[in-house]
From Swiss-Prot:
In plastids the minimal PEP RNA polymerase catalytic core is composed of four subunits: alpha, beta, beta', and beta''. When a (nuclear-encoded) sigma factor is associated with the core the holoenzyme is formed, which can initiate transcription. One of its GO terms (cellular component) is chloroplast. Belongs to the RNA polymerase beta' chain family. RpoC2 subfamily. Pfam families: RNA_pol_Rpb1_4 (PF05000), RNA_pol_Rpb1_5 (PF04998). It is an enzyme of class 2 (transferase). Its EC number is 2.7.7.6. Binds 1 Zn(2+) ion per subunit. This is DNA-directed RNA polymerase subunit beta''. It catalyses: RNA(n) + a ribonucleoside 5'-triphosphate = RNA(n+1) + diphosphate. Its cofactor is Zn(2+). Keywords: Chloroplast, DNA-directed RNA polymerase, Metal-binding, Nucleotidyltransferase, Plastid, Transcription, Transferase, Zinc. NCBIfam families: rpoC2_cyan. InterPro entries: DNA-dir_RpoC2_beta_pp, RNA_pol_beta''_euk, RNA_pol_Rpb1_3_sf, RNA_pol_Rpb1_4, RNA_pol_Rpb1_5, Rpb1_funnel_sf. It comes from Arabidopsis thaliana.
Length: 1376
């Protein structure tokens, strides 16, 4: 026992941790027996004192912290402001969640810190205080929940619940708080069972991988070591961790202070020596670890170090592998049981802040930072390198250095006050947290139409879906509008932009009685959902009525629905429309079938180069019968030339639909019937029939000719070829050829019947049997493709001028390939040639594609369709005239303007705002099949104005004769309507100088009203703005299909220039102030701008940051609860061991951890390549593998220690090192430069590969691999051990096939076979002696080579240490 004089006298309170340290020191000094005697006395003393001063705990002892009230109030205030910002669209949902969590976490932490001082001041002998803060029972976290606040809770998945529990358990919880609190309790109950089994399985795998590791030697003779330094280049290692790393280790090298040796090689380090080395300020200490031991199947005493049980060097025969496995696995099992007394309360961290020391002006270099958003959505600057920030005051200049990857929260030259936060240092730069990628789905709060305010790209992993990626921070807008599906009406008669009553779908009337305009004729139309008899069906359609409403009787000149194919309307696509080919006057004379120019826009609205923009199907190139198309180039064939015949044979095969242009083609008609397999056919194959012959029970032939019957898959094809049959003799060489065209005027010289053909003929050879054959001469229809049809005359000439390098050209194309059959179905006709308008632009332009879209504007029952193509300034337009009958059941009778009711008796215009009227907007659903309707009513809009404070410039007023009607109309304007303002288009029909319907209501005797000032702009529901050029007005005459431009030189004073703050189509977030003394706006989009007011459509903004995935297409209709956007963000898992254990398992199984990949495999490959290239072949593979293995080992040890240290669990590094050594000690033999010893792809030990390479004196190519603990257990030298772990049958079968031998070196094999385990007393000392002699022989043989190799290896390892010092991240250990 030590002398009393040498002992230090302590007189202070110690807690549980200090007692642990005291006990370990006692064992070091006095040994086990004496220590147990001392601890017995301490125990007796403790029980005596506890009995004398026992603590009683009552509910009154739980004292609530006085400052809790205002702390919670302050947090609620911050949360309310945050909610407002989210509502305005300034922060998105993830930023709001993060900020909310940090606000409440900080509040909870402040309360926790207040707790101890509060107890100390008010009641130092409070039983709760004494019990918890002495460490006797309970901890600060539990007391905090009793008297502070429970705070934020984790749900069973470890995710945060952002609603905090503000009450503590003393005050009692509300119902909501109680339910949230139960999540934590449930988490405890369920997770305890699950995690305990996980921890047990982890222990089993750990023991499995290292069970054979036994101390078998005193010294393996290695000269390698790992350097440990208290001062790394990046940061200081804490002294406590440094001491823990060194105690119990063995030095790998002598330590010199100056020229004096203070510690020698192979000396074990005790606490005294470590303290002396720290005092001397030793820079780096080289120690031996299990990593440096020269064998993988055992370990020596010096590389292991001291035994943790009795403080001496470990004994021979000690099963240190099993001890290591249990040391790592067991704390996990205990921690799973321990964690849940706090009930799933979230523990996290807040970022560190840099504050200004005093008032002053901020100065920094703006080139070194770039603007960004913080994780809370605040604007900030991110600095990449150390940034010097200078704060200038009146007489002091203070400099602060901001570390890299930090956020600067102030601007340059900004004035800051004392203690103001100027920078935020990221938490990740100091502590390593396991993070994970989390998806957060944002759902739409309301139904409406989606818009976004930036270009989006298509998400590459969702090629065929509607997911888009946002390239930059922008808003998504949901524009309001009530929606309803059109399932009640099979083909909705409501077109885009109709005016209608909102409750129209509740009407169950299926009939519409429609009165004609001039009451000449009353027609009754019926809806019917039964399409069995299309001839009796009539659908009321008003898509194209005659031009003058008051002249002729009610006449549907141009119908969109034909009786023959009644499902045409169902297939009508929203992205195609037809421009009628004839003028209106010609159409009145006769009912003309559907023909016109079809303008088609792709579904996505994007045209690429040489896209077909419009096409015209010429009725001259239509055929009703089936047949074969032939075309090509004239080519003389040598054989047929002798017979004086020219074959017209195509030499080019057509590849796509629109590829080849020809000037002449031939159509060979034939009658085709496709019959079911079971049909009874009444004619024979190769027989000749006449017209109207019965073919089957209900089919008769339309032409006469030769019958061909062909059986195909599950059907019979019956063809009738008309023409002449010719039986040739042997001299006719034409009989050898089949399928040729003969031009007119050519005959056969040698034949007896010499005749000339007037038209082209088609010669086809037919062979009914092998010997017999004949030739069928078939008539041919010849078509010449003339350039008479010129689409250019049908379009406005402006389109063909080269504006902005866009060109339109006309081409004729054949729709069917050469020799391809065309099949006509029943009565429909086949179009053979199509005239196309091809869109192209300048080759030098960088544009790969241009966008095109429709604009539809509805005014006074007129609908204009505009097409806009990229940069083209002129628009194509066509008109559909609507007639809404006055007494129609489903359509609003008041079709002029739903927001005005017209009294026919007085003719006075009365303004009446109707809430139940609206404008229809049509949509395709996501499956592109059925249509949805979006109804935009006045309840979705609000009016803003009048603008008393907005100045207008250069307004030229005009003298308009005072008229009461005009005054009312101009002054009132539409309130809350989404339809365009009437007074803009009201003068359009007047250009025809006809007194048509509009004039009845607005009797204007002054024609100058035509050229009135434009008081408003138009915007469509698409959000497309019809901008009017200030110097020219685009006016559409409803009776001709072209545009008029009224330039300023006609009436120089009709136009005005206004400059206002609000632009049309602009989006506003809520709370934006437009003018002084104006009310704050709600968020929305400007629909109508007048001189003194504006109408705004309500909208809800959602902020989205780059990388967010938007679900849905632009202007798609979304319903409430639809997924709008997905955010992907990183978040730290909450810090208890239940989340930590899976991370330990992931590291040990070498799986990548979600967002932070360990990247060890990649590092290994890179190192191998570089090192081999630098050092050359001889030792390249060995050294490359060594360095990567050293690097990955240290990284793994650090990551595992992080998890355990965060829980206050101390595990000695050597235990983790033994495990990590096993999973990093294998290399994979590669194919290049393969030697004859190992197979490519074989896993072998690194040292075995090294020895084999030296023995063969040639390089073996291999690379280091990381095995997980499971794979390492299945790749051992013992097949019995592998089979007892898992996959028993497979392992034993493979071992038998390979003829493997098990040397029974491990513990497990001997247990399985009932032998003596080679550890402890059963340790075989003879084995050690034999192996030592064997090693000495090898060393003598290879002394020269080995000395050379070890010198090289040492040099490279020293280089490696310096490299690692500079490259390992701050989160890693400084032990290399």
């Amino acid at each position: 026992m030590a002398e009393r004089a040498n002992l230090v006298f302590h007189n202070k309170v110690i807690d549980g941790t200090a007692i642990k340290r005291l006990i370990s020191r006692l064992i070091d000094h006095f040994g086990m027996a004496y220590t147990s005697h001392i601890l017995d006395q301490v125990k007796t003393l403790g029980f005596q004192q506890a009995t004398a001063t026992s603590i009683s705990l009552g509910i009154d002892d739980l004292l609530t912290i006085p400052s809790k009230g205002w702390l919670v109030q302050d947090a609620e205030q911050q949360s309310w402001i945050l909610e407002k910002h989210h509502h305005y669209g300034n922060v998105h949902a993830v930023e709001k969640l993060r900020q909310s969590i940090e606000i409440w976490y900080a509040t909870s932490e402040y309360l926790r810190q207040e707790m101890n001082p509060n107890f100390r001041m008010t009641d130092p002998f409070n039983p709760v205080h004494m019990m918890s803060f002495s460490g006797a029972r309970g901890n600060a976290s539990q007391v905090h929940q009793l008297v502070g606040m429970r705070g934020l809770m984790s749900d069973p998945q470890g995710q945060m619940i952002d609603l905090p529990i503000q009450s503590n358990l003393r005050e009692g919880l509300s119902l909501t708080e109680y339910i949230i609190s139960c999540y934590g309790a449930r988490k405890g109950v369920v997770d305890t069972a699950v995690r305990t089994s996980d921890a047990g399985y982890l222990t089993r795998r750990l023991v499995e991988v290292v069970q054979h590791i036994v101390v078998r030697r005193t010294d393996c003779g290695t000269i390698r070591g790992i350097s440990v330094s208290p001062r790394n280049k990046n940061r200081m290692m804490s002294e406590r961790i440094f001491i823990q790393t060194l105690i119990g280790r063995v030095l790998a090298d002598d330590i010199y202070i100056g020229s004096r040796c203070v510690a020698f090689r192979n000396q074990d380090l005790g606490i005294g020596l470590v303290n002396r080395l720290i005092t001397f300020g030793t820079q780096s200490i080289s120690i031996r670890t299990p990593f440096t031991c020269r064998s993988t199947s055992w370990i020596c005493r010096l590389c292991y170090g001291r035994s943790p049980t009795h403080g001496d060097l470990v004994e021979l025969g000690e099963a240190v592998g099993i001890i290591a496995g249990q040391s790592i696995g067991e704390p996990g099992t205990q921690l799973t049981l321990r964690t849940f007394h706090t009930g799933g309360v979230f523990t996290g961290g807040t970022a560190e802040h840099v504050r200004a020391p005093y008032n002053g002006k901020i100065k920094f270099n703006e080139d070194l930072v770039h603007p960004t958003r913080t994780r809370h959505g605040h604007p900030a600057f991110l600095c990449y390198i150390d940034l010097s920030v200078i704060i200038e005051s009146e007489d002091i200049i203070h400099s602060v250095t901001i570390p890299p990857k930090s956020f600067l929260l102030v601007q340059n030259d900004q004035y800051v006050e004392s203690e103001q936060v100027i920078a935020e240092i990221r938490e990740g730069t100091y502590t390593f947290h396991f993070k994970e990628r989390v998806r957060k789905y944002i759902y739409s709060d309301s139904e409406g139409e989606m818009h976004w305010s930036t270009d989006v790209s298509h998400a590459p992993e969702f090629t065929y879906s509607n997911v888009h990626l946002l390239p930059k921070t922008s808003h998504l807008w949901i524009l309001s509008g009530g929606s309803c599906g059109s399932s009640l009406i099979r083909f909705s008669i409501h077109k885009d932009q109709d005016q209608m009553n909102i409750p129209f779908l509740s009407a169950e009337r299926k009939s519409i009685s429609s009165l004609s305009v001039n009451n000449d004729q009353v027609s009754q139309k019926f809806f019917s959902s039964d399409f069995a008899d299309p001839k009796k069906l009539g659908i009321y359609d008003y898509s194209e009525l005659n031009g003058n409403l008051g002249t002729s009787h009610y006449n549907l000149i141009y119908s969109a629905i034909f009786h023959e194919n009644s499902d045409l309307l169902a297939k009508r696509r929203r992205n195609r429309f037809l421009i009628p080919f004839q003028s209106i006057q010609e159409q009145e004379k006769e009912f003309i079938p559907q023909s016109g120019i079809s303008v088609e826009i792709p579904i996505n609205g994007i045209f690429r180069r040489n896209s077909i923009f419009a096409f015209f199907d010429d009725p001259r190139y239509r055929r009703k019968s089936s047949g074969i198309l032939k075309y090509g180039t004239l080519k003389a064939d040598s054989i047929i030339q002798k017979e004086d015949m020219i074959e017209y044979r195509g030499v080019q095969k057509i590849k796509t639909k629109y590829e080849m242009k020809v000037d002449r083609f031939f159509f060979i008609p034939e009658e085709v019937h496709i019959l079911p397999e079971s049909s009874a056919i009444m004619v024979q194959n190769y027989s000749i029939i006449g017209v109207d012959t019965r073919l089957t029970l209900n089919i008769r032939s339309q032409v006469g000719g030769l019958i061909r019957v062909e059986k195909k898959k599950k059907r019979i094809e019956l063809k009738i070829f008309s023409g002449d049959i010719h039986f040739p003799d042997k001299t006719d060489k034409i009989s050898r050829h089949s399928g040729i065209l003969i031009p007119p005027g050519r005959g056969k010289k040698n034949s007896k019947e010499s005749k000339k053909f007037k038209n082209w003929i088609y010669v086809q050879r037919i062979t009914p049997t092998k010997k017999k054959f004949f030739v069928l001469v078939r008539p041919v229809a010849t078509y010449e493709i003339a350039d008479s049809i010129n689409l250019a005359t049908l379009f406005p000439q402006d389109l063909f001028r080269e504006k902005d390098n866009i060109q339109l050209r006309v081409f004729n194309y054949i729709l069917y390939g050469n020799g391809k059959p065309t099949r006509g179905i029943s009565d429909t006709s086949i179009q053979l040639v199509r005239t196309c308008l091809v869109l192209n632009w300048d080759k030098n332009s960088s544009l790969e594609e241009v966008r095109a879209f429709f604009v539809e504007v509805s005014t006074k029952g007129l609908i204009q369709d505009f097409i806009r193509i990229g940069l083209v300034k002129s628009h194509i337009s066509y008109i559909r005239k609507r007639n809404n009958s006055p007494d129609s059941g489903l359509i609003s009778a008041d079709h002029m303007n739903p927001f005005y009711s017209i009294s026919p008796k007085s003719g006075i215009l009365q303004q009446s705002l109707r809430q139940n009227h609206g404008t229809i907007r049509m949509f395709l659903n996501r499956n592109k099949e059925s249509q949805s309707l979006l109804i935009l009513s006045s309840s979705n809009c609000f009016r803003m104005g009048p603008f008393n404070h907005v100045k207008h410039h250069n307004v030229i007023n005009q003298s308009i004769k005072k008229n009461t009607l005009i005054t009312i109309k101009n002054s009132s304007g539409p309130l809350g309507t989404a339809t365009p303002i009437s007074n803009f288009y009201s003068f359009l029909p007047l250009l025809t100088y006809n007194q048509i319907s509009l004039i009845k209501y607005f009797q204007l005797d002054n024609l100058k009203y035509i050229f009135q000032k434009i008081n408003s702009y138009l915007i469509d529901e698409n959000g497309i703005i019809l901008n009017l050029d200030p110097y020219s007005n685009v006016v559409l005459n409803p009776f001709k299909l072209n545009w008029y431009f009224l330039h300023q030189n006609y009436h120089h004073n009709y136009c005005e220039e206004t400059s206002t703050i609000i632009s049309l189509g602009q989006f506003f977030c809520e709370n934006v102030c437009i003018a002084k003394k104006e009310p704050h706006l709600k968020s929305g989009q400007v629909l109508i701008v007048q001189r003194d007011s504006a109408v705004i459509r309500s909208a809800k903004p959602y902020l989205a940051t780059p990388g967010a995935k938007v679900h849905g297409h632009y202007s798609e209709i979304l319903y409430e609860g639809d997924t709008l956007v997905t955010f992907i963000y990183e978040k730290s898992r909450s810090g208890d061991i239940t989340q930590g254990l899976p991370k330990v398992e992931q590291v040990l199984e070498v799986r990548s951890i979600d967002s932070i990949s360990l990247n060890l495999e990649k590092r290994i490959k890179g190192w191998n390549k570089c090192i081999t290239r630098i050092l050359g072949i001889p030792w390249g593979f060995l050294i490359g593998a060594e360095l990567t293995i050293v690097q990955s080992r240290i990284s793994l040890v650090n990551k595992i220690q992080k998890v355990y240290r965060s829980q206050g669990v101390q595990i000695h590094n050597r235990h983790i090192e033994i495990i990590v050594r096993q999973i990093t000690s294998k290399v994979l033999v590669s194919e290049e430069g393969m030697s004859n010893v190992f197979l490519p792809g074989e896993l072998i030990g690194l040292l075995r590969a090294e020895r084999t390479g030296r023995a063969l004196e040639e390089a073996i190519c291999y690379r280091a691999v990381l095995l997980g603990i499971t794979r390492a257990s299945l790749n051992t030298q013992s097949f019995i051990s592998e089979a007892s772990f898992q996959e028993t049958a497979r392992v034993l079968a493979k071992a038998a096939l390979r003829g493997r031998i098990d040397w029974l070196k491990g513990l497990k094999e001997n247990v399985v076979l009932g032998g003596v385990i080679p550890a402890g007393t059963g340790f075989n000392k003879g084995l050690v002696h034999c192996s030592r002699q064997h090693t000495n022989i090898i060393l003598e043989k290879k002394t020269k080579n080995l000395a050379l190799f070890e010198g090289d290896m040492r040099d490279i390892l020293f280089y490696h240490r310096e490299f690692c010092d500079s490259s390992i991240s701050k989160s890693d250990f400084s032990r290399i």
